[in-house]
């Protein structure tokens, strides 16, 4: 939230808080009943997801109001939380995700399966924010040669021009720069 406050102090933002079920039930094995209908076991349906989500929404709304941040709330507590989040990214300029806490109730080690899914499938740039936020001094951008990675890099520059003066490091899963698709063009873009 400190990052959003910092950006909002420079340029007013509209913050959409997306509140998901604490578990993505689509990743949980379901029992198959008569006629192939998938049934969730009773023990799985007895949880306090809605109470937890509503509590988090209240904290979010109060924090936004206290800081003068315009906001919207999107509550997606259906059984396919990650799919709902991916759908939200189609209409977002930027997705901010806690690099420490994203679905840590399911798997503590980050990046966990859920975070990896979001990073692969998001339809807007994704920014991982640590819980002990400090103003960034460096930008780490990822590039895999795909059109979407170039688009995300360009969007980052358009959306957060105040970070463009930082040292920028381009990360790629490719072993050597000669193997990097369109190396000279991506180097020029991030220069």
Segments (PLM) and residue ranges:
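Gly/Ser-rich helix-loop-strand patches that form or flank binding pockets
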Residues: 1, 83-133
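Small/aliphatic-rich secondary-structure junction motif
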Residues: 1-41, 121-124, 134-191
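A general structural detector for well-ordered alpha-helical segments in enzyme core domains, enriched
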Residues: 4, 56, 60, 114, ...
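Structural beta-alpha unit
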Residues: 15, 20-23, 58-95, 191
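A short acidic, glycine-rich active-site loop
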Residues: 39-54
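Short histidine/acidic/glycine/proline-rich micro-motifs that form metal-
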Residues: 46-47, 102, 173-177
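Short, flexible loop segments at the rims of nucleotide/cofactor-binding pockets, characterized by
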Residues: 71-76, 104-107, 148
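Active-site-adjacent beta-strand anchor residues
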Residues: 74-75, 129, 142, 171
């Amino acid at each position: 939230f400190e990052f959003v406050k910092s950006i909002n102090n420079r340029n007013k933002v509209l913050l959409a808080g997306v509140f998901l079920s604490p578990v993505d039930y689509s990743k949980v094995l379901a029992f198959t009943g008569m006629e192939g209908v998938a049934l969730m076991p009773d023990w799985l349906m007895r949880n306090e997801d809605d109470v937890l989500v509503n509590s988090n929404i209240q904290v979010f709304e109060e924090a936004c109001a206290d800081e003068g941040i315009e906001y919207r709330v999107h509550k997606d507590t259906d059984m396919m939380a990650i799919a709902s989040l991916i759908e939200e990214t189609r209409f977002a300029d930027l997705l901010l995700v806690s690099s420490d806490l994203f679905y840590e109730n399911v798997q503590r080690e980050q990046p966990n399966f859920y975070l990896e899914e979001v990073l692969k499938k998001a339809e807007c740039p994704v920014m991982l924010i640590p819980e002990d936020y400090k103003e960034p001094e460096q930008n780490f951008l990822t590039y895999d040669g795909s059109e979407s990675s170039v688009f995300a890099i360009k969007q980052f520059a358009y959306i957060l021009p105040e970070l463009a003066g930082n040292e920028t490091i381009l990360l790629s899963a490719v072993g050597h720069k000669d193997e990097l698709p369109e190396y000279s063009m991506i180097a020029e873009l991030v220069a």
